[in-house]
Structure formats: C-alpha cells, structure tokens
Amino acid sequence: MSARHSVFAAALDAIGKTGLDSLLAPLTRGVGVVLTLHQVRPWSARGFAPNRILEITPEFLDVALISLKSLGYELVTLTEAVARLRTGRGRCPFATLTFDDGYRDNLECALPVLERHGVPITLFVTPGFAERSARLWWIELEEALRRLDRVSIEDADFRFAAMARNDAEKAAVFDDLYRRLREGSEQQLLDVVAALSAEARIDTQGLVDRLCLDWDGIAQ
C-alpha cells in the first residue's frame, strides 16, 4: 500500500468512526456513482502487495452491493447512467459497475456474485490482453521485486539501484521505480520491466494467460 493510499484509508476510517459519513451522505452522494473495478479474487495473504489497490475480494463485492441497495441506490447499466445524467430523471441515486482490462477472475469470481444480485456491468476489454499481445507490466514489476533482493538498472537513459531485502524495502522500491518509469517513455518502461522480469525469471506471457481472458472467455 502506497503512502498516499494509507493517508486516504486513514481519513476515510476516521470519517466512518465519527459518523460524518451518514450525516453528509445526502449532501455528497450526488445523482449517482460509477464504481471502476479491476480484479476480483480471494485475498492471498502477503506483506508485499503494491497492486492491492486494484483488487477486491468476492466477499467485499457482495457486501458493497448489499450496502448500495440498502442506501437506496439503483444498480443500472452504464447506458442508463449516462441517460440519467443527461436528462436528470430517476427518483433515487444510481450506481453502475465497470470492470477494466478483462481479467479472468471477473468471470470466475465476480460473475457469480453479480448474477446473484442481478447487477448489470460494463466490461472494458484491453484488446492486447485478450489477443496476448500486451503485457501486465505493473504485475510483472511486482512479481520481479518479490523475487529479487536487489535492483540494479544501468541503462544509457535510466539508472536505478536499491536494496529489496524485505517487504518494506520492496514496497519503497516499487513506489519509486513505478513513479520514475511513468515519468519516462512507454518503451523505456517496458524495456526496464522486461529486463527485471527476465532477471527474476518471470514468465510474462504466462502471466497474461493466467490472469486475463481471451476473446472466447470474454464472449461468455
């Protein structure tokens, strides 16, 4: 968990404990909400999990849907949500769910929960993942750092060196490296992560095969 995410989590926890969330809800919830989700899968306990912000558990999804209904939200399609924003119609606030990228667990873990609640969703598929032509570079980076105790990158345009002996050091390296790579070109990012993945013997193609649906799976 990044420092920024920790601050947000602490702030939200404090608001919840004071009861301000209930008092402010009628004034702050607006006409509706769009929940943008990625992975939905059982939690695998691990100390180093920098991409945890991109996943929730099926149990969390179930509780979230129950909570939305109890708060008076109507779960609608994205098309209906857009129509309500344009026309202002609707007697109660709406909630709509979207899932990004096309992860396999959306089908295996999220769909049973969604079907049980009768909730429509919108799936935004990354064609490169479905066609196996793109890489999950942020997950590659996490898995590489999990295996490596030291990171040393000597490139003409990018240099980086740090120890990664424990969860705290690995988290710090991930945050720093992630930030610096995102500031540069996409090709440099992919090249650096590819080099680290090769050093850590990460099967980058197998990672996409294991975590992402292909077009046949998406059609289901």
Regions found by a protein language model. Give the residues of each.
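Catalytic alpha-helical scaffold of carbohydrate-active enzymes acting on polysaccharides/glycoconjugates
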Residues: 1-220
